[in-house]
């Protein structure tokens, strides 16, 4: 319901420490989240636009911020053998590490207007709203959850504490170390291969 979706809007900090990166000898940092290996100067963002070098470290600028929340049938993800007939609490952020010309969510995935991410929610609030609203799962969707992996993984932990499953709808364009950590937290995934 709209009330459930509206219930997930607290104020959160604007950036969150990123996990997959390392410092380079020339003062830049390299993002190791996906195979693009973006090399960033202070204040610069990667191709995904949501991972940034800030104060000499990698930060995720969309942690706790969403392009919107929606309750969908699980078949819309599309998953037909994962709790068929159940509701899934779906959300995404902005940005993407791909640039598909055929993207159906380009207004979200390629948005550089972070202010349009009006819906804010902590991992615990997402899990609570999903559980209280009767959703069997939470889906990370609309844009690729790989780029907000830290947030998705924290949401997954909070969901699992409440018995709520998690679903990643992704292209799977992710580095090996991040891939192992990310998918270890997911209960189901739709890996949408891009061609």
For every predicted segment, state its role:
Residues 1-86:
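Flexible, acidic/Gly-rich N-terminal and inter-domain linker regions that tether
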Residues 53-189:
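Conserved Radical SAM active-site core
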Residues 189-195:
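Short, intrinsically disordered, charge-balanced linker/junction segments flanking boundaries
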């Amino acid at each position: 319901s709209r009330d459930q979706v509206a219930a997930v809007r607290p104020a959160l900090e604007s950036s969150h420490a990123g996990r997959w990166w390392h410092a380079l000898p020339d003062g830049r940092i390299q993002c190791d989240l996906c195979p693009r290996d973006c090399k960033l100067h202070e204040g610069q963002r990667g191709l995904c636009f949501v991972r940034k070098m800030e104060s000499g470290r990698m930060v995720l600028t969309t942690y706790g911020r969403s392009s919107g929340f929606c309750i969908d049938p699980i078949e819309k993800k599309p998953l037909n053998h994962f709790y068929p007939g159940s509701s899934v609490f779906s959300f995404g952020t902005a940005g993407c590490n791909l640039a598909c010309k055929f993207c159906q969510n380009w207004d979200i995935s390629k948005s550089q207007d972070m202010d349009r991410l009006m819906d804010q929610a902590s991992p615990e609030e997402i899990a609570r709203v999903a559980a209280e609203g009767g959703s069997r799962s939470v889906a990370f969707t609309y844009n690729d959850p790989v780029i907000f992996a830290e947030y998705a993984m924290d949401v997954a932990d909070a969901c699992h504490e409440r018995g709520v499953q998690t679903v990643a709808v992704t292209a799977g364009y992710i580095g090996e170390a991040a891939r192992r950590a990310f998918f270890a937290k997911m209960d189901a995934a739709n890996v949408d291969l891009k061609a």
